[in-house]
Design a protein with these regions (language model features):
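Repeated loop/turn-to-beta-strand initiation elements of outer-membrane beta-barrel proteins
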Residues: 33-38, 76-80, 125-128, 166-172, ...
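Transmembrane beta-strands of outer-membrane beta-barrel pores
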Residues: 2, 31-33, 42-46, 86-90, ...
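Periplasmic-side early beta-strands and strand-to-turn transitions of outer-membrane beta-barrels
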Residues: 1-61
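Gram-negative outer-membrane beta-barrel transporters
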Residues: 163, 167, 287-295, 311-422, ...
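Outer membrane beta-barrel strand-and-loop segments of large Gram-negative receptors
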Residues: 24, 107-108, 113-117, 149, ...
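Residues on the lipid-exposed face of transmembrane beta-strands in outer-membrane beta-barrel proteins
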Residues: 23-29, 66-72, 114-120, 158-162, ...
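C-terminal beta-signal and adjacent terminal beta-strands/loops
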Residues: 210-211, 223, 412-428, 432-486
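Structural signature of Gram-negative outer-membrane beta-barrels, strongest in the C-terminal barrel
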Residues: 123-125, 142, 146-285, 289-294, ...
């Protein structure tokens, strides 16, 4: 890619030119009661970048991903599954301040997951699954207070599926996790599904969740080569921001570095869901789901600083007591056997209980402009959590015109959302700055002929851009693609 530039700076580009390649290999093998699957993916990217006439550098990314799976089916009642996953992400960067000053950095992260599952089918209506797993993560990089960090955990799980009545089945599961740096956690879950009639079914579930901070949230130092934004981990934020400030790359520090003292805590949650599946006829299906999640120490992210080139820096933090609730609606319909239409909508309310209490107690104020008088924020003025839209809508239409060509159209609408607190009261209210609602649409036409697939398409059909808040939307992209099956 030659990159692109959305600003008027003659030297600095929004995204610098880069080169990349991807390789993928997959293998399947089956013999008697045994089956084996494996896949390997590699990715490499090289990019040169320029900050000004005297400051420039290069960035190299290498990724490796390996999946393996071994299945043993003893008989119709017993199955054993052994799965492994390994990934490695490596980033090397060289930065020249001038001809005599060179800074080098590296980031090398490895992750290994292994799981053994035993599935015992007691009878047609009852199944028992149990197993254990191992998780190991290793991170090596410079400019940390520890050059190498690691985390290991073991987990044990059990799940039982059965029927209460002929039309009502249930699933009970439990999981126990052991960590080397956090307290062990027990997480139960229960779900029940009822087939009310031939066209309507319901599902209710309740469960407890637990998630520790990963090293992406703790130590990540990533800049996206396409959109240009940066994401840095909680433990690395103070050091990285200080370095960027000393290089003159920070235009606005939104969050004080004092916010990154202490540790990022694990998050826990209690979740409740009530859903219905409705079939109006053979070609139309509706799914409606009501949900409520009560979360402690939610690990979230927000903008903490802006760069001199207008790009944003994100990092992670804890929210003490949070709830999310809303409704989800999805439908799929087939028209004339050739046209498939999918609709999706979500209404989301996501708020911080501490912020709600502060507003209720009259402790939160705001200004419309820096010189205007302050006024008290009311409960109706509180918008909610950062980077959450109240309304999301998506539409997909696919049309297969006999044997001639296929047309695919998709459109996604997102209502306004806030990325940062712009009036200094430490929460997102209706008087802060927002990213305006947007509509992104794509369309493509494909023609199949023997082993060839020719595609012509347009991404971001209506040419939506927001350079300041969403730099990864460069504008309308017109493309063509030829696939050859060998």
């Amino acid at each position: 890619s030659n990159g692109y530039d959305l600003n008027d700076d003659p030297i600095l580009n929004t995204v610098e030119p880069y080169k990349s390649y991807t390789g993928f290999l997959r293998h399947n093998f089956k013999k008697n009661k045994w089956s084996y699957f494996s896949s390997v993916r590699i990715y490499n990217e090289n990019q040169n970048f320029t900050l000004n006439e005297n400051s420039y550098g290069k960035n190299i990314i290498n990724e490796l991903g390996i999946n393996t799976s071994i299945n043993y089916i003893k008989n119709k009642n017993y199955k054993l599954i052994f799965e492994n996953y390994y990934t490695n992400y490596k980033n090397d960067e060289e930065f020249r301040l001038n001809q005599n000053s060179i800074e080098e950095s590296f980031f090398n992260q490895s992750l290994f997951k292994s799981e053994l599952r035993s599935i015992y089918t007691i009878n047609k209506k009852n199944t028992l699954t149990f197993g254990l797993g191992f998780y190991s993560e290793l991170l090596k990089r410079n400019n940390f207070n520890r050059e190498e960090v690691s985390q290991n955990s073991f987990n044990y799980f059990v799940q039982y599926e059965g029927f209460i009545f002929e039309n009502t089945n249930y699933v009970f599961g439990a999981r126990y996790d052991q960590y080397d740096e956090y307290e062990s956690e027990f997480s139960p879950r229960f779900a029940i599904r009822t087939q009310i009639n031939d066209n309507v079914s319901s599902k209710i579930s309740i469960g407890k969740g637990f998630k520790t901070p990963d090293y992406r949230q703790l130590y990540f130092n990533f800049s996206n080569s396409i959109s240009g934004y940066s994401v840095i981990g909680f433990n690395a934020a103070k050091e990285i921001i200080s370095n960027l400030q000393s290089l003159g790359q920070i235009s606005n520090l939104i969050i004080s570095q004092d916010e990154f003292e202490g540790k990022l805590k694990p998050e826990t949650s209690i979740s409740f869901n009530l859903g219905f599946n409705i079939k109006t006829n053979k070609s139309t299906v509706f799914d409606i789901n009501f949900f409520r999640n009560q979360i402690s120490n939610l690990i979230d992210y927000k903008i903490i600083a802006s760069k001199v080139n207008g790009q944003s820096i994100f990092s992670y933090y804890n929210l003490n007591k949070v709830y999310t609730q809303g409704i989800e609606f999805n439908s799929t319909s087939t028209v004339f056997n050739d046209i498939e239409i999918s609709l999706g909508y979500q209404f989301l309310e996501a708020k911080d209980n501490d912020s709600k209490n502060q507003i209720k107690n009259g402790e939160v104020f705001a200004r419309r402009t820096p010189s205007s008088p302050t006024f008290q924020i009311k409960p109706k003025d509180y918008f909610g959590l950062y980077n959450r839209s109240k309304h999301n809508f998506n539409l997909k239409i696919s049309y297969a015109f006999k044997d001639y060509f296929d047309i695919y159209f998709k459109s996604k609408y997102r209502s306004k959302y806030g990325l940062s607190d712009s009036n200094g009261n430490n929460l997102l209210d209706d008087f802060d700055d927002f990213v305006e609602s947007n509509l992104i649409s794509d369309i493509s036409i494909s023609k199949n002929y023997k082993n060839y697939i020719l595609t012509f398409g347009v991404e971001n059909l209506f040419d939506y851009t927001d350079r300041e808040n969403i730099p990864n939307y460069p504008g309308r992209i017109i493309y063509s693609k030829l696939n050859i099956k060998l």
